[in-house]
């Protein structure tokens, strides 16, 4: 370089890869809020011009089949963990003398407890679940021995045996027995996987709080500074802004959707078939997943990011992708408008019915008549025409979670550049788009609504977004 400043050379030139099933939303400015009369009189959506950055957004709501992939990964990870713990109890010495000589629980031992010959030397496609989704060592309690153990990672090269008749040995049966509901809880005597065990851990950094408080002296309730035993002032450190599920009273989010919402949301109504079949039956595989809380949706986003980054890691690619996340309220409205200015609906027209009398979305058009539009409940995620950005069902079908906390005055106090009001103490989260059980007012792109973050509904789903990195004009 002849002593000249040339900068660090990257191994590969970066290019933004469009995630499968997403559309590129180019970003730009638009008039956010109600352009028509606010017939409800909420006065919480005044018009203003804002700008959002480009991003990728799922073309459809996340479907049952897509969400099942997340559920199955968590299920497999927990199962491998239980099998590994039982293998350690059976053979506490940490090695398997009969490796390769038979099919028994010993082959599911933690990779760190196997000899180099036994352990899978390749990087697993996915790391493990909960505290097991890191390759670093950590301490935990073996549920079978109630003793502290040191764990690094699971061996994902071994295929789990689900056929009860093919379980290889008694320890394997004992481990699997803990994963299924008891006989007393089994309807018709059929024991199924205990969905209460399906929990996922993910760690986030509260960047906004860190930017404002990092290094600031902590104070008590009276405003007096706090000191340690040596008389030094206690300041906020990085660990204070790490949101770690499973610690500090924060539970691991449950993963399995709440299927009882189909019964609980509607009193004196027969919806048992939806409760029994909607998430389970293959007929509904391409329908939007519902019964998912805001926390569960965020957990899915974290897992989806992890899945892609683990794939790149397996390819020995040092690059990581921007994280998947829920859209902000402004991003959602900008995407729903499809580039159309002052539009009332995503398709641009002033009505939810076409000039030929065809309904343009799945909603409740007439009092008491849910099916006049052709669907009583939800429809497949790729139903009706997409808007000009290629997004389906941005109005109707299911309402969608956003990352934004609900505040009546957020439009007045928020920034005009990538506006978003986040408040982790505010459990009311914005939902947008209206659903199959809503009237046309909630389908309008400027209508705001909210639901509590820990509440699951039969009419709320979600879709994810990913930031676009670089100049979109290149």
PLM region spans:
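Post-signal-peptide N-terminal segment of Sec-exported extracytoplasmic proteins
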Residues: 13-46
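Short capping motifs at secondary-structure boundaries
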Residues: 55, 62, 71-80, 304-314, ...
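Functional-site microenvironments in short loops/helix caps that host divalent-cation chemistry
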Residues: 2, 24-25, 29-31, 36, ...
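Short, P/G- and charge-enriched loop/turn segments at secondary-structure junctions
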Residues: 10-12, 45, 448-453
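Sec-dependent signal peptide cleavage junction
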Residues: 1-21, 87-128, 132, 137-140, ...
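Short, structured beta-strand segments at or near domain termini in extracellular proteins/domains
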Residues: 458-474
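Short proline/glycine-enriched turn/loop segments at secondary-structure junctions
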Residues: 419-423, 449-456
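A structural signal for well-ordered alpha-helical segments within the folded catalytic domains
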Residues: 60, 64-68, 295-299, 330, ...
């Amino acid at each position: 370089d002849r002593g000249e400043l040339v900068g660090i050379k990257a191994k590969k030139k970066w290019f933004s890869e469009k995630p499968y099933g997403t559309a590129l939303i180019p970003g730009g400015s638009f008039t956010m809020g109600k352009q028509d009369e606010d017939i409800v009189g909420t006065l919480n959506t005044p018009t203003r011009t804002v700008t959002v950055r480009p991003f990728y957004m799922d073309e459809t709501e996340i479907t049952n089949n897509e969400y099942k992939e997340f559920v199955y990964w968590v299920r497999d990870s927990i199962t491998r963990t239980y099998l590994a713990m039982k293998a350690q109890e059976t053979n506490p010495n940490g090695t398997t003398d009969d490796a390769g000589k038979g099919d028994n629980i010993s082959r599911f031992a933690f990779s760190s407890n196997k000899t180099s010959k036994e352990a899978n030397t390749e990087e697993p496609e996915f790391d493990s679940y909960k505290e097991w989704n890191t390759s670093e060592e950590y301490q935990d309690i073996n549920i079978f021995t109630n003793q502290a153990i040191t764990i690094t990672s699971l061996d994902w090269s071994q295929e789990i045996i689900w056929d009860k008749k093919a379980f290889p040995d008694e320890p394997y049966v004992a481990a699997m027995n803990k994963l299924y509901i008891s006989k007393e809880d089994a309807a018709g005597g059929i024991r199924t996987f205990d969905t209460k065990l399906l929990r996922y851990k993910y760690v986030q950094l509260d960047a906004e709080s860190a930017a404002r408080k990092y290094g600031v002296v902590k104070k008590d309730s009276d405003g007096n500074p706090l000191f340690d035993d040596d008389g030094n002032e206690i300041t906020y450190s990085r660990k204070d802004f790490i949101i770690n599920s499973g610690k500090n009273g924060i539970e691991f989010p449950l993963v399995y959707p709440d299927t009882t919402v189909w019964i609980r949301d509607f009193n004196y109504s027969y919806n048992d078939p939806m409760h029994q079949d909607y998430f389970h039956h293959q007929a509904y595989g391409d329908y939007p997943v519902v019964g998912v809380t805001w926390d569960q949706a965020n957990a899915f986003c974290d897992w989806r990011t992890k899945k892609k980054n683990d794939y790149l890691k397996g390819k020995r690619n040092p690059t990581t992708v921007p994280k998947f996340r829920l859209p902000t309220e402004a991003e959602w409205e900008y995407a729903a408008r499809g580039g159309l200015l002052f539009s009332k609906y995503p398709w641009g027209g002033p009505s939810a019915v076409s000039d030929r009398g065809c309904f343009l979305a799945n909603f409740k058009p007439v009092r008491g008549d849910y099916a006049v539009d052709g669907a009583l409940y939800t429809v497949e995620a790729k139903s009706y025409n997409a808007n000009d950005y290629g997004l389906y069902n941005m109005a109707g079908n299911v309402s969608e979670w956003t990352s934004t906390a609900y505040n009546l005055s957020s439009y007045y106090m928020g920034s005009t550049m990538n506006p978003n009001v986040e408040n982790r103490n505010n459990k009311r989260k914005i939902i947008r788009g209206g659903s199959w059980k809503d009237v046309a007012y909630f389908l309008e792109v400027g209508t705001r609504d909210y639901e509590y973050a820990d509440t699951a509904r039969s009419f709320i789903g979600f879709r994810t977004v990913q930031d676009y990195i670089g100049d979109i004009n290149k």
